[in-house]
């Protein structure tokens, strides 16, 4: 990612212009939402997904319905496909995509948006100095977001679970209610929209 033409979701939320064309790599919640948004704004969108369906973590019925809606809206979708390389130079980016037949297709776009996952922001924020326990690159917490250090809590993309804004908001409410002594139930991550 260069932050200008090959971007992540954070840059996609703050672009200062509407791109004419965009290839979105990854069709999870964030990739699908941004593909839909930019398409609605008039950008020609190609959505590329490695898995056999878009929204691969959702129910098959949901995935199929969203796929039909995307097709009707004019969003091109390639499943069982992967981006092999991106060539930048003057003009449009050239994106080499291996399709489901194993053949390389070359597509061009003004912007390539990588939405294949969120890296937790755990570097240089003082976790080491506090001896916060980590687990697979994220802060280890209990059901109420307590860390192993008394009085230190963690929510959002630095803990395990979906790295989505509305999930972090729900985690914050659960955490703060617990701190305040209000009886609260832990979040059920199997029922997240």
Residues covered by each model-derived region:
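FAD-site-proximal beta/loop scaffold in flavoenzymes
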Residues: 2-18, 107-184
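Rossmann-like dinucleotide-binding cores of NAD(P)H-dependent redox enzymes
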Residues: 13-14, 19-23, 29-103, 163-169, ...
